[in-house]
Amino acid sequence: MTTTNKAIFLDRDGVLNDEIGDYVWKLDDFIVSPGVPESLARLKAAGYYLVVVTNQAGIAKKLYTAAEVHACHAKLQDACGHLLDALYFSDAHPSVSDSILRKPDSGMFEKAVARFNLDPAQCWIVGDRYRDMEAGANIGVRGIMVGETEAVDFTPRVADLRAATNIILRA
């Protein structure tokens, strides 16, 4: 019998960092949201892999580069004590290119499932958009929506990652 692992999939903008406008790629604008480092530490201590899954369509639109995304991810890792196990991003946008990595498709999730031998039934997605919830549901991952970015009916829905962490750790 093979042992499987559990993970928290995390959308980036609006969950881990403050969302400013349509895209966040400048280091000066990349602000880690309050409570994120502590929440990640609690989840890691509970045995979860921590995996970022983020759409970065600004690359396809030529607004910024993959190098700028990597710089933001390095800043995030530094702020969070390097607790994140993987940071995946899709650089596609439907107006420019197609990709199975782009949420609501589940390609980024599937990469992590294979890499870390994850059991989707033991995993969660925390995101601020319905497409995050759809991507997780496509492979059997439970979702928690945070914030009020989209006016959609989804339960559970909480204020931020701190509140989502409390739900996950009580489950």
Where are these regions (language model features)?
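Generic enzyme active-site microenvironment
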Residues: 9-11, 53, 126
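Metal-dependent phosphoesterase signature
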Residues: 13-34, 59-68, 92-100
